[in-house]
């Protein structure tokens, strides 16, 4: 019992530390903020990150300019990346290893006041437009996991002709 309660204590301490730090994304990759949908109209609590490095390996020399960008949308349940971005062998790591420029959609724990699903899709569409512009009009691959998969499907329908292939993993 002592070990069980000590584990719960450590977990709570980790969560409190994470909250004090402002609940930053817990990606296992270095990144920079590309866009924050909180500043869009309509606003949502989603952000777009560009993955810059894997460990100490800079990506400038290993990205293939002929490959389309990849936008990964992870599940909306909880906070932080799921299968997509917390290990080098994740979707992010594998796409980077293959030379694709990778972007990752994250979100803050609380939605914007009055936020709706159409607001989220509108923000995601602006992310697609922005990334397409930054990559000479190339349509990004949309990669969605679980709830992120149905968001990717809705987004692809809204971005007809602007988005590339859609990969839906474990999506309802």
Question: Which role does the model predict for each range below?
Answer:
Residues 154-158:
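Active-site signature of alpha/beta-hydrolase-fold catalytic machinery across serine-
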Residues 23-28, 32-111:
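Short, surface-exposed "cap/lid" segments of acyl-processing enzymes
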Residues 39, 46, 50, 106, ...:
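Catalytic domains of lipid- and phosphate-ester/thioester hydrolases
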Residues 161-172:
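A conserved short beta-strand
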Residues 1-33, 40:
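N-terminal targeting or regulatory segments adjacent to alpha/beta-hydrolase or S9 domains
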Residues 115-133:
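Alpha/beta-hydrolase active-site loop
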Residues 60-62, 132-135:
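A structural boundary/capping signal
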Residues 143-152:
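Gly/Ala-rich beta-loop-alpha elbow adjacent to hydrolase catalytic centers
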């Amino acid at each position: 019992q002592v070990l069980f309660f000590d584990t719960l204590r450590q977990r709570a301490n980790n969560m409190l530390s994470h909250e004090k730090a402002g609940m930053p994304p817990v990606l296992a990759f270095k990144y920079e903020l590309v866009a924050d949908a909180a500043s869009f109209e309509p606003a949502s609590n989603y952000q777009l990150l560009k993955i810059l490095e894997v460990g100490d390996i800079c990506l400038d020399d290993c990205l293939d300019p002929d490959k389309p960008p990849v936008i990964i949308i992870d599940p909306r349940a909880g906070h932080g990346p799921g299968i997509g971005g917390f290990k080098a062998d994740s979707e992010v790591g594998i796409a980077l290893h293959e030379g694709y420029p990778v972007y990752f959609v994250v979100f803050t724990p609380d939605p914007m006041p009055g936020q709706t699903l159409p607001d989220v899709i509108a923000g995601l569409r602006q992310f697609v437009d922005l990334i397409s512009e930054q990559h000479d009009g190339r349509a990004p691959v949309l990669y969605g996991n679980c709830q992120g998969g149905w968001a990717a499907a809705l987004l692809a329908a809204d971005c007809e002709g602007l988005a590339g292939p859609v990969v839906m993993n474990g999506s309802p």
